[in-house]
Every structure is written in C-alpha cells, then in structure tokens.
C-alpha cells in the first residue's frame, strides 16, 4: 500500500465512476482498477460491490475511505512543514476562487502577485463555494478566496475587503435617472438571480427579502454575465457585485446604481485550514491582496 493507492481510492469515492476517477488522477482506468484490486488483496477485504453497474462501497470500503482522507491530509501537512523550512513565498500554491469573484479579482491581483512573489507558482481553481471548501478540507487546495458564509467558519478566515452590490437596471427603466436607490424602494419588485449553488444568490436573496422584494422565478442564470445580458434586454433587474460592474454609470444598455439604507455588501476573504504550518504564507498573501485592493475599492466607491 502506498499514498498513490489511497489517492485512487478517495478519487473513486468522490467521483463514483472509474473513468472520471482515473482522469482526475491522470492515469488510465485499467491502472486505477488494478490498484484498487491489489489494495483489496493486500487488506484481505472487499472494498467495492461489483454486482452493480454503479460504484458501491462496502462498509469496510467506506471506513477505509474516511481513514485514507485523514492520512492524505496528514501527508499534506508534512509537505507543508517541509516547505516551510525554505522560502515562505516560493513553490506551488493552489488557490481556489468562486466564479463571482475570480474573473473580476484576478486581473487586479495576479500581475501584482507575480511581481511581489516571483518564486511563487500559483495554480488557480474556480468552483462554487461548497466545492472549494471540500477541496480545501481534503488538501487539494491550499487556500481559497471567497465570500464569507456560515460554511467557511470551520476554516481560518482572513477578511480582504468588503464588496458592495449595485442595482443593475435596463437603460429605459423608470429609475434610470436616479443617483442611487434605497433598498426599501425594492419592495414588491422581482429580481433576477443566479441558480442554486452560488453563495452570491443566497446573499442577494437575503438583502431582497429584507427589503420586501422577491426572486423572478421565470429565469435563473449560471453566471453574472448572463444576468447582465438579461438586464440589458429589459428582462428584469438584479444586484451585481461591485468588482463586476464597469466604472461608467451606464454601459451596453445597463445602468448601475448604488444602493443604501442599508448598503448591500459581502466580505471577501482568504480561507485556509486551521493548524496549517503554512499559516505565515497565507497571512502574507492576504495582507498583500488587502493592501492592494483597499485603494482599488476606494476608487470604485467614488
């Protein structure tokens, strides 16, 4: 038994499909299947039920998967401890980002991070919050940049900046001549929202419910750009995070208005596993991003 065998087993448990598990491990399906059988022979127990077309784990298999996850997390810690003995800001770093942050934040920080930490090899992974937290917990990610939610409280959260949300309306909307909109004015309105799984959806819905607004259930978007295009087409209004909003008050048929009483906003944070030996690396990374974004966010509020 070796570490690679445990990685195969955990991948199979996550994907419940031999080919997809093999692809995620960058090996052929016969290689992964063969190693799982060898693991069963070595342990003397059946880990999988092979009477079904589905991948079903036996009770012994499920127990071994959980223990394998623990072992792999500890191996990750050992590697981090070894890395800590060298230069803190060098070597590989796997960073996760949510889709409503990544496309808009990365152009602002990546060139700066490359200049500041030239020896840092950054690998960027985009996924929804629940997926990022699972990958962070399993050790696949070193840290993640996301909007703080209840589920992220199990990790160390380092706030980076607060990001306001702006109301996006079509250019012929009755409110298009306003300078800003009170949240109470949204009472009775129906807003376009992202589909389930996006934390921004839950946050925006919360602000809308407080204001007496509701969701337009005729359509749910997969991305902010789809929401923007639906607004431009006159199909509704929505809340968009400030980083995704252009500096112009109006562009491409969409008018962007600040909201107040209260100002809807979310906190963007860098999160990492508690007890990580590379805490100094993550804190330094967070400090650098926070300092850079502080000035940028101030320009957006003007």
Curated annotation (Swiss-Prot):
Q: Point out the DNA-binding stretch(es).
A: 18-37
Is Isomerase among the key words of this record? no
Q: Looking at the record's lineage, which domain of life comes first?
A: Bacteria
Annotated membrane-spanning segments are none
Q: Name one GO cellular component term.
A: protein-DNA complex
Keywords, alphabetical: Activator, DNA-binding, Transcription, Transcription regulation
- Molecular function, one GO term: DNA binding
> HTH lysR-type domain: from which residue to which, for each copy?
1-58
Q: Which PROSITE patterns does the entry mention?
A: HTH_LYSR
Q: Does the keyword Transmembrane apply?
A: no
Please give the function described in this protein's UniProt entry: Required for the induction of a regulon of hydrogen peroxide inducible genes such as catalase and glutathione-reductase.
In which family does this protein belong, per the annotation?
Belongs to the LysR transcriptional regulatory family.
User: What name is this protein filed under?
Assistant: Hydrogen peroxide-inducible genes activator
């Amino acid at each position: 038994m070796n570490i690679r065998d445990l990685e195969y087993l955990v991948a199979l448990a996550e994907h419940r499909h031999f080919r997809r598990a093999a692809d995620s491990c960058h090996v052929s399906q016969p290689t992964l299947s063969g190693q799982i059988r060898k693991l069963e022979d070595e342990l003397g127990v059946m880990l999988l039920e092979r009477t079904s077309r589905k991948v079903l784990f036996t009770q012994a298999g499920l127990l071994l998967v959980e223990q394998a996850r623990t072992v792999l997390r500890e191996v990750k810690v050992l590697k981090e401890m070894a890395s800590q003995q060298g230069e803190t800001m060098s070597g590989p770093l796997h960073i996760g980002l949510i889709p409503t942050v990544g496309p808009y934040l990365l152009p602002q920080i990546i060139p700066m991070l490359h200049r500041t930490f030239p020896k840092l090899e950054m690998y960027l992974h985009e996924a929804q919050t629940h997926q990022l937290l699972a990958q962070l917990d399993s050790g696949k990610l070193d840290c993640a940049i996301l909007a703080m939610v209840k589920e992220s409280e199990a990790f160390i959260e380092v706030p980076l900046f607060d990001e306001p949300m702006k109301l996006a309306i079509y250019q012929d909307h009755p409110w298009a001549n306003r300078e800003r909109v009170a949240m109470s004015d949204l009472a009775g309105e129906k807003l376009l929202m992202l589909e389930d799984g996006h934390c921004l959806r839950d946050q925006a819905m919360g602000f809308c419910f407080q204001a007496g607004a509701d969701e337009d259930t005729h359509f749910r978007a997969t991305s902010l750009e789809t929401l923007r295009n639906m607004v431009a087409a006159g199909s509704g209004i929505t809340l968009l995070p400030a980083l995704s909003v252009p500096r112009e008050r109006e562009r491409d048929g969409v008018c962007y208005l600040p909201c107040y009483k209260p100002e809807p906003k979310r906190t963007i944070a860098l999160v990492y596993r508690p007890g990580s030996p590379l805490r100094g690396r993550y804190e330094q990374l967070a400090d650098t991003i926070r300092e850079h974004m502080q000035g940028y966010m101030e320009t957006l509020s003007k």
